[in-house]
Curated annotation (Swiss-Prot):
Residues 364-391 have a biased composition (Low complexity). GO terms for biological process: mismatch repair. SMART domains: DNA_mis_repair, MutL_C. One of its GO terms (cellular component) is mismatch repair complex. This is DNA mismatch repair protein MutL. Keywords: DNA damage, DNA repair. This protein is involved in the repair of mismatches in DNA. It is required for dam-dependent methyl-directed DNA mismatch repair. May act as a 'molecular matchmaker', a protein that promotes the formation of a stable complex between two or more DNA-binding proteins in an ATP-dependent manner without itself being part of a final effector complex. Residues 363-397 are annotated as: Disordered. One of its GO terms (molecular function) is ATP-dependent DNA damage sensor activity. InterPro entries: DNA_mismatch_repair_CS (IPR014762), DNA_mismatch_repair_MutL (IPR020667), DNA_mismatch_S5_2-like (IPR013507), HATPase_C_sf (IPR036890), MutL/Mlh/PMS (IPR002099), MutL/Mlh/Pms-like (IPR038973), MutL_C (IPR014790), MutL_C_dimsub (IPR042120). Belongs to the DNA mismatch repair MutL/HexB family.
Amino acid sequence: MPIQVLPPQLANQIAAGEVVERPASVVKELVENSLDAGATRIDIDIERGGAKLIRIRDNGCGIKKDELALALARHATSKIASLDDLEAIISLGFRGEALASISSVSRLTLTSRTAEQQEAWQAYAEGRDMNVTVKPAAHPVGTTLEVLDLFYNTPARRKFLRTEKTEFNHIDEIIRRIALARFDVTINLSHNGKIVRQYRAVPEGGQKERRLGAICGTAFLEQALAIEWQHGDLTLRGWVADPNHTTPALAEIQYCYVNGRMMRDRLINHAIRQACEDKLGADQQPAFVLYLEIDPHQVDVNVHPAKHEVRFHQSRLVHDFIYQGVLSVLQQQLETPLPLDDEPQPAPRSIPENRVAAGRNHFAEPAAREPVAPRYTPAPASGSRPAAPWPNAQPGYQKQQGEVYRQLLQTPAPMQKPKAPEPQEPALAANSQSFGRVLTIVHSDCALLERDGNISLLSLPVAERWLRQAQLTPGEAPVCAQPLLIPLRLKVSAEEKSALEKAQSALAELGIDFQSDAQHVTIRAVPLPLRQQNLQILIPELIGYLAKQSVFEPGNIAQWIARNLMSEHAQWSMAQAITLLADVERLCPQLVKTPPGGLLQSVDLHPAIKALKDE
């Protein structure tokens, strides 16, 4: 067979073998493109695990009409232009292969509009030569990509797709990782027309632990130790779980990011494992969410087809830096607070050297004793060091250069050009509000909040009651019923049986399913908030309440149930309060604007401050 140039579609399908492994790979590439475009909101719609439809819609800068055809061509990108750019990459994408590869194994449609254009344009590629057709369309500022029938023309690849549930779980995990990398972006994920995940953007200076708790769970949040460690141009931030309380479930939480890019790096994992090895068993793994910031010149991201790995120019330096950062926080957690007396304090001690890794350790100089590292709330430089010259750094690198690179992907300020509200925006407009930052827990069941410089107290049991009521109140569809493993059979009177039969349709909307006979009623299913309740007490009380009613409204019944549910928390922790408020703000946004009585009480500190100043 003679040497010949492959047709464009065949060449793209070969490239797709590396880029498009499964539907989750498509979602990752397209969402990263949205982030590179400066999007602050991304909506992801999935059907049948991504095999039928993947739709990514963002409010980024958009693509000009003249560049739409280029966007679907191979090796066409706006991220880099020269070899110098390739050596200092800060964007998530840079190869220009994703859209061309995806369009070769699916029916891809690209619709986009920039702020300068009066109308949007739509592009799609088809045929053996992948010719691009562009036509006008209706679309707000931003971009929408639709990927239909993935692998429709490559049956062998489609045959290797797993079940719908498995493929969607992979997509869900990718979105979790991206949501942990970009707290400033709102991300909504739906599957088969149903909203599955809603990650609201965290405002600058806001409490990132809310999204952390929503993704990693309350158990991780309760054991999380905040890290903020710096040396020269290396910065390590994030959270590591207390190794003394790490469980197998927590050990699955291992998220690492390098300059905002999600990674699976053995060097970083090894450094963290070494720092925790004295407190972990042989079969245990550490749990962490860590963000490493490094000069883009000192890391090569173009070493893996799917960009899952990186290569550090100074790998030993990075390893020891991470090791000392994690070890310092773990050691501070074990230290007791300093006594407030005049007794002489012990001399500062040196942090133990990393003897396992070869080479000189640049971070083991003596360090002064510092306060205990806080849980879940980042503190100013809990284990930081003064900026020092970067050992063995490449000559000629300037710190200002790194700042310029970091600023290239900053989201444009919203004041530069106001955008017209999109049709779907009003539904989430109320979610832009927040109760504020949780400062501490007072009297075991009240949260002390700070918002815009104002202090307030919030009753956690009342907030929990409103959340339960929102979870029980049916919307457009009835509340999902959870079948009971062992149905509950109760004896009822004729009056109670009559009331139950009249309220049957209302109870069905609330997710309560029952069957009655002559003198008994059998409860077969209840909604999720009732699963952990003592149903042998709650259900008879509910039946007694219904027997006294003449009108059976689902909303009134949901309100009664919410008021009579037993709280799962006798004493609230910070992590539980943060998780609760995140759920309340998502499901009950109206409570933020107009808090009902008994929920929120402002605290006036001015008299106390005035009294202190007058002393």
